[in-house]
């Protein structure tokens, strides 16, 4: 059976993966999520929140507000803030999410016509 990596090894893997693929890559997100879980196990919720926030912001930037991954990462971030009893950060991140969501919905899509299509 494969041994579980140490927190330090996970952080090193995350930094290497982030450097190669970026922080919004699926592998980077999964490693950062594991780091977040480890910090939660140690009851270091401030560090867990830090990695959860990085993940959420990277997904929001790369995939947008309507992507299920972004929403799942937001839920994980809120859970970390709850464990840290940081109500202000919960309110802030939820307000930001809905503000961005509303802005996204307000973007007008130009009306297309068939006049410019060449056959």
Question: What do these predicted ranges mean?
Answer:
Residues 1-119:
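Intrinsic-disorder-linked linear interaction elements in eukaryotic regulatory proteins
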């Amino acid at each position: 059976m494969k041994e579980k990596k140490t927190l330090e090894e996970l952080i090193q893997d995350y930094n290497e993966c982030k450097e190669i693929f970026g922080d919004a890559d699926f592998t980077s997100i999964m490693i950062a999520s594991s780091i977040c879980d480890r910090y939660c196990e140690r009851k270091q919720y401030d560090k867990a929140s830090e990695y959860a926030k990085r993940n959420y912001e990277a997904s929001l930037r790369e995939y947008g507000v309507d992507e299920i991954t972004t929403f799942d990462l937001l839920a994980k971030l809120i859970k970390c803030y709850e464990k840290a009893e940081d109500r202000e950060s919960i309110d802030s991140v939820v307000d930001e999410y809905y503000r961005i969501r509303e802005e996204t919905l307000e973007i007008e899509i130009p009306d297309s016509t068939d006049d410019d299509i060449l056959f």
